[in-house]
Amino acid sequence: MAGNRNEEMVYCSFCGKNQEEVKKIIAGNGVFICNECVALSQEIIREETAEEVLADLAETPKPKELLDILNNYVVGQDRVKRALAVAVYNHYKRINFTESREDNDVDLQKSNILMIGPTGSGKTYLAQTLARSLNVPFAIADATSLTEAGYVGEDVENILLKLIQAADFNIERAERGIIYVDEIDKIAKKGENVSITRDVSGEGVQQALLKIIEGTVASVPPQGGRKHPNQEMIQIDTKNILFIVGGAFDGIEDIVKQRLGEKIIGFGQNNKAIDDESSYMKEIVAEDIQKFGLIPEFIGRLPVLATLEQLTVDDLVRILTEPRNALVKQYQTLLSYDGVELEFDQDALEAIASKAIERKTGARGLRSIIEEVMMDVMFEIPSLEDVTKVRITKEAVDGKAAPVLETA
């Protein structure tokens, strides 16, 4: 009987242990592997992946190189681009420094970033461009959709799920990614005094975000949504994730004026020019942000403050034409596939920029304006074989005339 038992015993093809010495043995095509060897294999793969990620980060571009990359895609905002280049370089240098030295008594803090600037000034695009240039996973979240645990809405952990998905569920890569949280000003407390009642979309969300921003091992539901008992969770350490948060902070310039001892512009007085408003934005300090409604602990985890300026007509015209993937170049490429040249008059470009400013959409509104102007042209051109050139005039932008079509 004993001999029969040995003949029926299954052994791991890798470590030689039998089925009684381990918890489980998985059968394959003529081979067997035990749970212990599976766990060891996973650990080896995890370590090798982490080494590959660190090797990639060791080649992080220097601040000047990052600035050159940003300049290829982003027009203006020179102060902000320099600040971001330094902060991002220091962040990944910190990761390399921490990982490469064991008994190190110097604790380098994260360089998380707070960007303040009007709608359409380039906050999201700057963050996207940085992540793309570094080849790291990137996720965007809207703070207004977040609620603290226990309320209807999105848990803050779901932000981390977006990053994990962007990293193709490679946790090591995700743990060194970048998360951009937009509309952060919309979760400001209403006033400086702490509310007695629970603040679902204000301080409570700030407290929840604070934990993952400062660094914690978070449990993330793999399918998103709310956490449920007995649900298997993904564990992710956020200590090396770079958080960039942004918002318009409408009205914060009045708080700055009060602090500086100047009267707030009221009825019967002329509004300040954009240049004056921009100068106030440059004076923003942590005290002003706290008065606006962000809690001190949250502000303290965002040491790098970058304020973006309102884009002018000249800035928007440059955005339309200069960057590597400028909108004008994109539409010229589209029409070139139909064998047609596309040209914008200078005053047409200025009219497009002026419309974006009037609509208070900034750079993000430029594409929709061009679409309005180009819609009929893009509909007709593929069927008009004799057209060789399309010229967009100011009158076409203003809706007073059709674009000029030139034929062979």
Curated annotation (Swiss-Prot):
Zn(2+) binds at C12, C15, C34, C37. One of its GO terms (molecular function) is unfolded protein binding. Residues 1-53 form the ClpX-type ZB domain. SMART domains: AAA (SM00382), ClpB_D2-small (SM01086), zf-C4_ClpX (SM00994). The keyword Chaperone applies. Keywords: ATP-binding, Chaperone, Metal-binding, Nucleotide-binding, Zinc. SUPFAM superfamilies: Glucocorticoid receptor-like (DNA-binding domain), P-loop containing nucleoside triphosphate hydrolases. It comes from the Bacteria. ATP binds at P118, T119, G120, S121, G122, K123, T124, Y125. One of its GO terms (biological process) is cell division. ATP-dependent specificity component of the Clp protease. It directs the protease to specific substrates. Can perform chaperone functions in the absence of ClpP. NCBIfam families: clpX, PRK05342.1. Component of the ClpX-ClpP complex. Forms a hexameric ring that, in the presence of ATP, binds to fourteen ClpP subunits assembled into a disk-like structure with a central cavity, resembling the structure of eukaryotic proteasomes. Belongs to the ClpX chaperone family. This is ATP-dependent Clp protease ATP-binding subunit ClpX. The lineage of its organism: Bacteria, Bacillati, Bacillota, Bacilli, Lactobacillales.
